[in-house]
Amino acid sequence: MKEKKNWLGKVVLLIAVIAAVAVYFLVPGVNKMMNKVFTMFASGDFTVVRDFVASYGAYAAVISFLLMIFQSIAAPLPAFLLTFANANLFGWWQGAVLSWTSAMAGAAVCFYIARILGRDVAEKLTSKSGLAQIDTFFERYGKNTILICRLLPFISFDIVSYAAGLTSMSFMSFFIATGIGQLPATIVYSYVGGMLTGGTKLFVTALMILFALSALIFMLRKIYMDRQSKKEKGRI
């Protein structure tokens, strides 16, 4: 039964990929739109992302939700730009809810792509070295890897989701850890995004560095406690 489900999942994903490729090449304007989206994320300017989302008017929230899933699959596009844009457009807490739920959906998609299609596909969508780095985290910290990596802004959110799908971790364990782990960053980024203007890059950079240092201290403390625990066991 399990093999049948995996086979069915692979067929569904394969059909979805073929359909996406066909649409990209055959539907007028889609190629141009995709290039525009990639250029938008590559700009590193949240105002560009905000204006793009806002241009869809009443459908802005839907477009934002789809963009978050898209950037999750096409790792490592920067999700925080979209989080800033959501907060700036919809208000900080409404933007936080939109960013959190859409990021959870994106994480679930990445997890199942890796779980069903395997490492080769995950490496093509991310990078071999990136997955290897997260593999090392999983070997050292197990399920705690999800929480640790979600707190580190310099580690790709999406690569962690792909890597988790390649482990024996259950989807529910992954989903819960992801929801808890990404919540603090989503709230902080959304609160800041609600106040952002084009000239506050220095403040944002300082905030991200502070957040990264806090997470690093947490991780180092965890490593120290683990080593101390092993030493005490060795003395017994």
Describe every region a protein language model picked out.
Residues 63, 98, 176-177, 189, ...:
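Hydrophobic core positions of alpha-helical segments in small-molecule transporters
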Residues 2-10, 20-64, 104-159, 166-167, ...:
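Membrane-interfacial helix-loop-helix
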Residues 67, 102, 106, 180-181, ...:
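Transmembrane alpha-helical core residues of multi-pass small-molecule transporters
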Residues 83-84, 111, 120, 162, ...:
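Transmembrane alpha-helix boundary and packing residues in multipass membrane permease domains
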Residues 65-94, 154-160, 172, 179-188:
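Transmembrane helix boundary and interhelical junction motifs in multipass membrane proteins
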Residues 88-103, 108:
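Structured, soluble extracytoplasmic/luminal domains of envelope-associated proteins
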